[in-house]
Regions:
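Conserved non-catalytic scaffold segment of RNase H-like nuclease domains
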Residues: 1-119, 130-133, 142-156
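Acidic, Mg2+-coordinating catalytic module of metal-dependent nucleases/exonucleases
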Residues: 90-96, 102, 106-107, 139-199
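Short, flexible loop segments at boundaries between secondary-structure elements
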Residues: 123-131, 188-195
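Metal-dependent nuclease catalytic regions and adjoining charged, substrate-binding loops involved
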Residues: 199-205
Length: 209
């Protein structure tokens, strides 16, 4: 039975390996209910408590200096907020193993429940795309191209902009389950915050500037 509440989720990190000391430095989640985007999102920059390798910063554009200029909190300061936001939801993630691994590692550092213990259901859009389009490219960029989704504002791989794109991709991939247009028409306008371009349907619950 499909869950009423879904969260489109993405993270940015210092590297690839949560079990080898890499840390999360950005979290974003966009809420949907019954396949309709709501006004709610959670977007946080996070201090990783370690260096940010140049090769990682080249991907997401976040350096330690930038994070410190945003007064980014440590994960220990926001982990409970993230857990409460995700609890009981279906999580829509592209390459879910990566983000789930980092979130669970960060939660475990704090003694918090894992995503599974929070009763979250995981849906991996990468696996969905590989099944639906076998032998074809299945990256988020490739899927945006396939579904003619505008990604011109995506300069870096930011967690929030990637969530916004993934929301459109997911609704397009699963269009037979509900109306793609209705998901966007069902929400009103809200003002965008200053640090990241975003569609008007988002009201950020918490974001450190």
């Amino acid at each position: 039975m499909a869950r009423e509440r879904q969260i489109i989720l993405d993270t940015e990190t210092t590297g690839f390996y949560a079990d080898q000391g890499d840390r999360m430095l950005e979290f974003a989640g966009i809420e949907m209910k019954n396949r309709q985007l709501t006004h709610q999102a959670l977007h946080l920059y996070i201090h990783p408590e370690r260096d940010v390798p140049a090769e990682a910063a080249a991907v997401h554009g976040l350096t330690l200096d930038i994070l410190e200029s945003k007064n980014a909190p440590k994960f220990a300061e926001v982990g409970q907020q993230i857990a409460d936001f995700l609890r009981g939801a279906e999580l829509i993630i592209h390459n879910a193993k990566f983000d789930v691994g980092f979130l669970n590692m960060e939660f475990q550092r704090m003694g918090l429940p894992t995503l599974q213990e929070l009763d979250c259901e995981i849906t991996d859009t990468l696996a969905m795309a590989r099944k639906e389009f076998p032998g074809q490219k299945a990256s988020l960029d490739a899927l945006c191209t396939r579904f003619e989704i505008d990604r011109s504002k995506r300069i870096f791989h930011g967690a929030l902009i990637d969530c916004e794109l993934l929301a459109e991709v997911y609704l397009a991939m699963t269009r037979k389950q509900g109306s793609f247009a209705d998901a966007f028409e069902a929400v009103g306008e809200t003002a965008a915050t200053h640090h990241t371009p975003r569609p008007q349907f988002l009201k950020v619950l918490a974001a450190n500037a």
